[in-house]
UniProtKB/Swiss-Prot annotation:
A molecular function (GO) term: magnesium ion binding
Binding, substrate: 41, 65, 88, 145
TM region(s), chain numbering: none
CDD domains on file: SK
Entry-linked InterPro entries: P-loop_NTPase (IPR027417), Shikimate/glucono_kinase (IPR031322), Shikimate_kinase/TSH1 (IPR000623)
KW ATP-binding (keyword) present: yes
Species of origin: Halalkalibacterium halodurans (strain ATCC BAA-125 / DSM 18197 / FERM 7344 / JCM 9153 / C-125)
Reactions that this protein is recorded to catalyse: shikimate + ATP = 3-phosphoshikimate + ADP + H(+)
The protein's name in its UniProt record: Shikimate kinase
Record text on cofactor binding: Binds 1 Mg(2+) ion per subunit.
Subcellular location: Cytoplasm
Amino acid sequence: MKRIPSIRERNIVLIGFMGVGKTSVGEQLAKRLFRDFIDVDQEIEKTWKMKISDIFRLKGEEAFRKIEREMTIDYCTNTSLKVISLGGGAYMQDAIRTACLDHCIVIYLDLSWSLWKERLNVLIDNRPVLQDKKVEEMEQLFTKRQPTYQKNSFQVETDGREVAEIVSYLEEVIKLGWEIYGS
C-alpha cells in the first residue's frame, strides 16, 4: 500500500480561472518553499511539442482534457514536494478534483471579474477556450466555474495584491498549517 505523504510533503496545487496568476504565484512560491514548480499546461505543451491553442485546434478539446487529466492525476498521486499550477478548466474534471483533494493542498487564487476583464487583451490569444467568445460568454464561464473552485479549497483573494504579496501570504499560511497539523 502506498504511503500517504505528510502535510509537509504534499504537493500544493493552485487553481483558479485562466489568467489569474497561478503560474506567476506558483513559480515564486515554489522557490520560497524549496520545491519544484510544475505548470501542467507547459508540461502538456512540451509533451505534445505544440501550443495548447494548437492542440485544441488540431486534436480537439477532448484530447487535450484527456492528457491534462492523466498528467495531473499522475503529478498529484505519484509525486510530492511540488507546487503545481493547473489550467483554468482542469479542476472542473471530477477525476482531477478528486486527486487534488485526496493527495494535495488545494489553493484557489480568486480574482474579481472586473479585474480579470482588464487582462483580457493579453489573455485572449493564448486561451483557446476564449476564442470566438463574446465577453458575456466569458463572464458566464467565469461565473460557472467559481463554485467548483471555491468548494474544498483554501481561497485567496488576489484583487489589488502584487504577486510578491500573495506569495508571502501563502508562505506564511502554509508554514503555519504545517506547524498546526504536524509533520
